[in-house]
């Protein structure tokens, strides 16, 4: 008999940056991948051509979240993991509705993973002890807070707390952990002055790139014991 096809890994926000790097990492390992994307970047076509299932989704409403969950449920009988990478970033600033900022941040960072974890729970169960994973991507600001991005920090803190709650709910079949990055990689338009200021905020004074995240994700997926924990990726920034 042939070897059974691995269950897919679901990555939200898989069309660019860290989500895209994770998708290609798994594809190169012959691991089936399902990604969500909101905007059709050129990279999406490359993923489709490589065999990834790419589902356009709008997580700005609960109906959009559940419509995406329905598509996943129709496409697979099980999941190896869910990586909650989809994110948004809004600051409190003059002229911006504070209620809109808070609602947007809570919708993408709290409502979306909360609803998806419940809706897709049965796809994660039934595969054995510690055989499935959920990984929430939070942020360095969970511990420190942010005076300029209060709603963003609060929503990521809520997601961090949900990590422990879902770990209790889903053990021992499913491990649930979070990764809390600070600066991982720059945007192309970031100027030299900004880059240097950002690098100086950590002890390691470098932007490590996607591989640092990929290596930690691989560790969490491989572990048969670690659950309910948050893993900072901040280069010692908390010691500055």
Curated annotation (Swiss-Prot):
GO terms for biological process: one-carbon metabolic process. It catalyses: (6S)-5,6,7,8-tetrahydrofolate + NADP(+) = 7,8-dihydrofolate + NADPH + H(+); 7,8-dihydromonapterin + NADPH + H(+) = 5,6,7,8-tetrahydromonapterin + NADP(+). InterPro entries: NAD(P)-bd_dom_sf (IPR036291), Sc_DH/Rdtase_CS (IPR020904), SDR_fam (IPR002347). Its EC number is 1.5.1.50, 1.5.1.3. One of its GO terms (molecular function) is dihydrofolate reductase activity. Transmembrane segments: none annotated. It comes from the Bacteria. PROSITE patterns: ADH_SHORT. The active site is at residue 152. Keywords: NADP, One-carbon metabolism, Oxidoreductase. CDD domains: PR_SDR_c. Pfam families: adh_short_C2. It is an enzyme of class 1 (oxidoreductase). Catalyzes the reduction of dihydromonapterin to tetrahydromonapterin. Also has lower activity with dihydrofolate. Belongs to the short-chain dehydrogenases/reductases (SDR) family. FolM subfamily. This is Dihydromonapterin reductase. It comes from Escherichia coli (strain SMS-3-5 / SECEC). The lineage of its organism: Bacteria, Pseudomonadati, Pseudomonadota, Gammaproteobacteria, Enterobacterales. The gene is folM.
């Amino acid at each position: 008999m042939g070897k059974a096809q691995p269950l897919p890994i679901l990555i939200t926000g898989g069309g660019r940056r860290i989500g895209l790097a994770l998708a290609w990492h798994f594809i190169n390992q012959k691991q089936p991948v399902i990604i969500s994307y909101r905007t059709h970047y050129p990279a999406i076509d490359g993923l489709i051509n490589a065999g990834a299932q790419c589902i356009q989704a709008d997580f700005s409403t609960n109906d959009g979240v559940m419509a995406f969950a329905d598509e996943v449920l129709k496409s697979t009988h099980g999941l190896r993991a869910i990586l909650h990478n989809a994110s948004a970033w809004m600051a409190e600033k003059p002229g911006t509705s504070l209620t809109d900022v808070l609602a947007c941040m809570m919708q993408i960072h709290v409502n979306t993973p909360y609803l998806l974890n419940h809706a897709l729970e049965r796809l994660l169960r039934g595969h054995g002890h510690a055989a499935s994973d959920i990984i929430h991507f939070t942020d360095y600001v969970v511990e420190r807070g942010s005076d300029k991005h209060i709603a963003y920090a609060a929503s990521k803190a809520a997601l961090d707390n949900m990590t422990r709650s879902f770990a209790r709910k889903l053990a021992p079949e499913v491990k649930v952990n979070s990764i809390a990055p600070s600066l991982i990689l720059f945007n192309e338009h970031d100027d030299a002055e900004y880059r240097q200021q950002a690098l100086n905020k950590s002890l390691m004074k470098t932007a490590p790139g996607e591989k640092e995240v990929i290596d930690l994700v691989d560790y969490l997926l491989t572990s048969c014991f670690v659950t309910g924990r948050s893993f900072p990726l901040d280069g010692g920034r908390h010691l500055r």
